[in-house]
Regions:
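Short, acidic/polar
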Residues: 56-71, 144-152, 218-229, 317-323
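Noncatalytic carbohydrate-binding groove/subsite architecture in carbohydrate-active enzymes
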Residues: 39-45, 53-61, 180-296
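Boundary/entry segment of secreted carbohydrate-active catalytic domains
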Residues: 34-64, 68-74, 78
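Aromatic-rich peripheral "rim/lid" segments of glycoside hydrolase catalytic domains that contact
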Residues: 155, 164-187, 196, 200, ...
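Structural preference for beta-strand elements that scaffold enzyme active sites
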Residues: 45-49, 74-76, 111-113, 160-164, ...
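Bacterial Sec-dependent N-terminal signal peptides
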Residues: 1-35
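Short, solvent-exposed loop/turn elements at domain surfaces
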Residues: 56-62, 82-86, 143, 344-345, ...
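Substrate-binding cleft and catalytic face of glycoside hydrolase catalytic domains
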Residues: 70, 74-88, 97-214, 280-282
Length: 381
């Protein structure tokens, strides 16, 4: 009789090994599955977008470009369409960067947004001054505004879906900001800007865009402004809440009431520049020269965001997106101001050189817990 040299595994051990083996295979499959895509997750709710810079559009920043192509279905240009970039001199229009931005969106079947036509910032001084450096008269400034709006909007007619026609025209108390536009033309500069934009592209959607509209005084000012525009026959399609939020502001209730108040005017609401600042802010921008110990207090996460802060940010995004999802009939678009934490403007404002973590993707382009938190809202629904 031949001697058996094999090893017999007891049946009880086999019964234990098989379930563990199956679990490991299943666990591996789950974590190698395709990452959820934001634009697909929110397709029945609102457009989901990002603001792009030149490096991302040109392909120099391939990491961010790939994230944009995968996750977003609408784009806004950070700077290419602002006056100082596209119309830097009286007789000079520079369309090349903006053309690349629009072509990027068209190539990737994205809804393209124009930001911005009339703003007090990032507008060259020559717009408001004559050759002697003195303020121009009303008619001269109106003509310059008209030429700029008609030239830029016509150049992208039926290619750019909607425009932030006027940006940040209000003070915190809801009164009109005393910008050069206001001082030289008067408050009807807003009506004129919308009229010029509509005439240049009757099919384009026209928006008013501002920050801190979640605060009641400023919101009331915006409501009065929109009503005035509507009373003069302006077809304003929506209002943009910039969405540069803090960890404790606005509350979900403030955001909810803001959306409802604007929806009552018959306009859609868009979150146009969303990010959440995780760093200390109050009383720091006035200090020009920061001491080393002060720098540490206002830049506490230089080495990375701790798990506790990461979880708090995820909860914050979850609360905000629950409110947006609940108001999906009135919220048309949510656009993040940037793509990864690495390229966020908040790394250099209000204090240069800090490490901030305001977006859904980390510095290496990986989704953060905040990403999982917001997609979980829809999946759970």
């Amino acid at each position: 009789m031949q001697k058996h040299t094999g090893y017999i595994v007891p049946n009880k051990i086999i019964k234990t090994i098989i379930p563990v083996f199956v679990f490991l295979i299943t666990f591996s499959e789950i974590h190698t599955q395709e990452q959820p895509v934001l634009k697909d997750i929110f397709k029945n709710y609102f457009l989901i977008g990002a603001a792009l810079n030149e490096a991302q559009v040109s392909g120099e920043d391939t990491l961010c470009a790939q994230i944009v192509k995968k996750h977003f279905n609408t784009i806004t240009s950070e700077n290419a369409l602002k006056w100082e970039f596209i119309h830097p001199k009286p007789d000079m229009y520079n369309f090349e960067p903006a053309d690349r931005f629009v072509e990027f969106g068209e190539k990737n079947n994205m809804v393209i947004m124009g930001h911005t036509l009339v703003w007090h910032a990032q507008t060259p001084r020559w717009v408001f001054e004559n050759e002697n450096g003195k303020p121009v008269d009303r008619e001269t400034l109106l003509n310059r505004m008209k030429d700029h709006i008609q030239t830029v909007v016509s150049h992208y007619k039926r290619r750019i879906k909607g425009w932030d026609v006027v940006n940040e025209a209000l003070n915190e108390d809801g009164t009109l900001r005393q910008s050069p536009w206001m001082k030289i033309i008067g408050e009807d500069y807003l009506v004129k800007a919308f009229e010029y934009a509509h005439n240049a592209d009757p099919d384009a959607e026209l928006y008013y865009n501002d920050y801190s509209l979640e605060n009641i005084p400023k919101r009331d000012g915006a409501i009065a402004l929109i009503k005035k525009l509507q009373s003069q026959g302006i077809e304003i399609a929506g209002v943009g809440l910039q969405g540069h939020y803090k960890m404790d502001w606005p509350t979900a209730a403030q955001l909810d009431s803001t959306i409802k108040d604007f929806a009552a005017l018959g306009v859609k609401v868009m979150i146009t520049e969303l990010d959440i600042d995780v760093l200390p802010y109050k009383d720091i921008s006035a200090e020009v020269t920061l001491k080393v110990e002060m720098k540490g207090k206002i830049d506490p996460y230089k080495g990375g965001l701790p798990d506790s802060a990461q979880a708090a940010l995820a909860d914050r995004y979850k609360d905000l997106f629950e409110t947006l999802v609940k108001n999906k009939d009135n919220v048309k678009r949510v656009t993040f101001w940037g793509i990864t934490d690495k390229n966020s403007w908040l790394n250099n404002w209000p204090v240069p050189g800090r490490s901030n973590y305001p977006l859904l993707f980390d510095r290496n382009g990986n989704p953060k817990p905040a990403f999982d938190a917001i997609i979980g809202i829809v999946k759970n629904n």
